[in-house]
Amino acid sequence: NKYSIGIEISNKGHQFGYEKFSKLQISSAIHLSRYLIKKYKIKKKNVLGHSDIAFDRKKDPGEKFPWELLSRKGVGIWHEINSEKLKKLRKKKIHKTEEKKMINFLKKIGYYTKNLSKINLVKLVKSFQRRFRPELINGKIDKECLVIAQKLSKLYR
């Protein structure tokens, strides 16, 4: 591609028996990514997965991809919020105005948010959850998602 570099990592995917990525795959991806980031001066926030760009069509690399680990190794971003604090927010429902805030945060992060149907909003939220809250992917905006998105949106100023 003219504006991106793609790294393919072998996996059966969600349709054919989605597998955990091997340590070798992840260490190789980290090594190659760090090389490319340095060589092409890529910002951490611009390290993305297929589903970040095409949430309506793609699920990869998916919830088993260790984005948090990659971030600790200098590849991509992570929210750095204590997971125990976050889990307490998971069951808290949000108001309609907070749903609009969530969509605005997702837009700041770089997700495409124009003309979202209800179905595409669910797909968008699932994509966000696969990357930044892989423990629960339900497509529902809750307080936990809102807090994570708000924190991440501050990294995109």
What are the roles of these predicted feature ranges?
Residues 4-48:
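Long, well-ordered alpha-helical scaffolding segments within enzyme catalytic domains
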Residues 23-41, 55-157:
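Cell-envelope/ECM-targeting effectors and their regulatory/trafficking segments
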Residues 2-4, 65:
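Short, solvent-exposed loop/turn segments at the edges of secondary structure
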Residues 46-57:
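Acidic helix-start/capping segments at beta-turn-to-alpha-helix junctions
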Residues 17-19, 51-52, 87-88:
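A short, structure-level motif marking secondary-structure boundaries and short turns
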